[in-house]
């Protein structure tokens, strides 16, 4: 299927979308699909992947930051923290 005809992400109706996106990214981190020091997808990429507004993607990343899974370096991006760092948060 071409990228411009991608199936919409199957969001649950009773859970805010930013929470669901954070859950997906957190699972990718836990599964090792996103590894320490690796950048997570950019906000524009997340908006395209999940079909949401940029503010929704930003809120999802903020949840992960608050939980200690990622940290942001201004002008460089948002990166996965080492496992030991997110376990103690």
Q: Can you say where each PLM-predicted feature lies in the sequence?
A:
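Extreme N-terminal segment that seeds HTH/winged-HTH DNA-binding domains in transcriptional regulators
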Residues: 1-52, 59-62, 66-71, 76, ...
């Amino acid at each position: 299927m071409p990228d411009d005809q991608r199936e919409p992400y199957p969001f649950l109706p009773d859970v805010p979308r930013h929470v669901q996106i954070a859950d997906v990214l957190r699972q990718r981190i836990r599964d090792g699909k996103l590894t320490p020091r690796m950048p997570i997808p950019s906000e524009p990429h997340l908006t395209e992947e999940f079909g949401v507004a940029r503010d929704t993607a930003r809120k999802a990343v903020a949840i992960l930051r608050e939980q200690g899974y990622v940290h942001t370096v201004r002008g460089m991006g948002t990166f996965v923290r080492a496992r030991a760092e997110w376990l103690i948060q």
